[in-house]
């Protein structure tokens, strides 16, 4: 919807001063890459002097045409031009998971695993400078945990889908008497200390990390055991 897109655009606008680049190869947002200097990335990682890819998105109909390679090449070119140590990105261990990069594609492009989170999300990196310090997760991302019981969600406006679905999930939880707390992350400092490797959407249940996949109200109720 228009409001969803506005929330995302507003978030982007505020990041451009921090060095964020949004590069699109096809119209209407079907293929794009979004990256930012690691110092300003909204994730709990330690990696000074690198670029962090927030999102490398190629929609279904566009897959298989080399757009991912083209977008990644543009990011690599820019990183070299800026004299960065390399590029890092999140992916799931072993397989493609929703809202995360494809590990097989990254491996094929020369990325290696820099660090592993207990929840099966990896930080991958492509070094561009010799003897560059490897990026790594902060402890809060390496061992994701919260103290609260019930469902706890951390989310940002980086992905337009959160604007639409988070209130719907909140309503569904309230309606069914499900314990649910949502923490809307609105600044970099808070994002860099979230107790999860992903900050766009990190859902916990009874202290344990559950998923980075943005839930619809129906999906959420299924997770909560309500049919």
Language-model features: locations:
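Conserved catalytic-core motifs of GNAT/GCN5-like acyltransferases
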Residues: 90, 107-124, 210
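Conserved beta-strand in the GNAT
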Residues: 24, 28-39, 52, 57
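Conserved GNAT acetyl-CoA-binding A-motif
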Residues: 79-98
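Conserved acetyl-CoA-binding loop-helix of GNAT-fold acetyltransferases
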Residues: 58, 64-80
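Active-site rim helix/loop that mediates acceptor-substrate recognition in acyltransferases
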Residues: 1-26, 40-42, 189-191
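Non-catalytic, surface beta->alpha helical segment in thiol-disulfide oxidoreductase systems
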Residues: 206-227
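Conserved acetyl-CoA binding element of GNAT-fold acetyltransferases
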Residues: 44-60
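Local sequence-structure signature of Cys/Sec-based thiol-disulfide redox active-site neighborhoods
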Residues: 140-175
């Amino acid at each position: 919807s228009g409001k969803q897109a506005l929330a995302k655009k507003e978030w982007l606008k505020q990041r451009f001063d921090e060095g964020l680049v949004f590069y699109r190869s096809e119209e209407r947002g079907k293929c794009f890459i979004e990256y930012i200097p690691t110092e300003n990335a909204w994730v709990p990682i330690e990696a000074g002097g690198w670029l962090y890819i927030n999102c490398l998105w190629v929609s279904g109909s566009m897959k298989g045409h080399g757009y991912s390679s083209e977008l990644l090449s543009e990011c690599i070119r820019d990183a070299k031009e800026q004299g960065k140590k390399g590029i890092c990105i999140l992916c799931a261990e072993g397989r493609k998971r929703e809202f995360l990069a494809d590990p097989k594609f990254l491996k094929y492009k020369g990325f290696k695993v820099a660090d592993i989170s207990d929840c099966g999300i990896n930080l991958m990196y492509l070094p561009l400078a010799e003897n560059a310090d490897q990026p790594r997760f902060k402890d809060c991302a390496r061992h994701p945990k919260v103290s609260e019981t019930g469902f706890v969600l951390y989310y940002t406006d980086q992905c337009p889908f959160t604007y639409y679905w988070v209130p719907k999930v909140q309503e569904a939880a309230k309606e069914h008497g499900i314990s649910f707390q949502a923490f809307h992350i609105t600044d970099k400092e808070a994002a860099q200390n979230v107790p999860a490797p992903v900050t766009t959407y990190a859902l916990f249940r009874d202290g344990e990390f559950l998923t980075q996949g943005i839930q619809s109200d129906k999906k959420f109720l299924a997770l909560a055991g309500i049919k």
